[in-house]
Amino acid sequence: AFSLAPVCKHIRQYFGDEIYPGDVIFHNDVFSLGNQNNDVAVYKPVFFEGRLVAWTAVKGHQADIGGAVAGGYNPNATEVWQEGLRIPPVKVIEKGKLRKDVWELIFANIRFDIVRHDMQAEIGAATIGERRLLELLGKYGLEHFTAHKEALFEATRRMMEAEIAGI
């Protein structure tokens, strides 16, 4: 979870106030907190009572992302552009509407159609996550959600620190 959280902050800085309900953002850029080109993430802002309160995010390793060789692993690469398409934060869906130009630009640079389907599945998973989160927010309210989210993050931080201290 924490590997995705810094990118959410980066996306907020990147788009500023231009993040809307219904947006779906792709990202894999190693120069802006991505870990490798083939690991493409989908980010979906969650708005509750008109405010951005959370994100859902899904990351998957894709079979291809373009580049000099099929599959993305190029042991002879001397620069990142030989490893595949770099995707800085980009809205593929804005305010619930597919940006066909962006969608087609991305997939025109990828060899395998299965990647398009995998990315549709990632969007679906992020959308289901958003729906479920909105159900929880509606049932328990923003205050309880925020308190439990912070408690979960704090517990995770403590466990991670304990594991590192044990090394």
Please give the residue ranges for each predicted region.
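N-terminal leader/propeptide and maturation segments of large enzyme subunits in energy/redox metabolism
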Residues: 86-166
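Solvent-exposed alpha-helices and their adjacent loops that cap or buttress functional pockets
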Residues: 16-19, 35-37, 49, 79-80, ...
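Gly/Pro-rich active-site capping loops and adjacent beta-alpha segments
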Residues: 52-110
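A glycine- and small-aliphatic-rich helix-loop capping segment at beta-alpha/alpha-beta transitions
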Residues: 1, 43-47, 74
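A short, hydrophobic, proline-anchored segment that marks a local hinge/packing element in signaling
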Residues: 40-49, 57
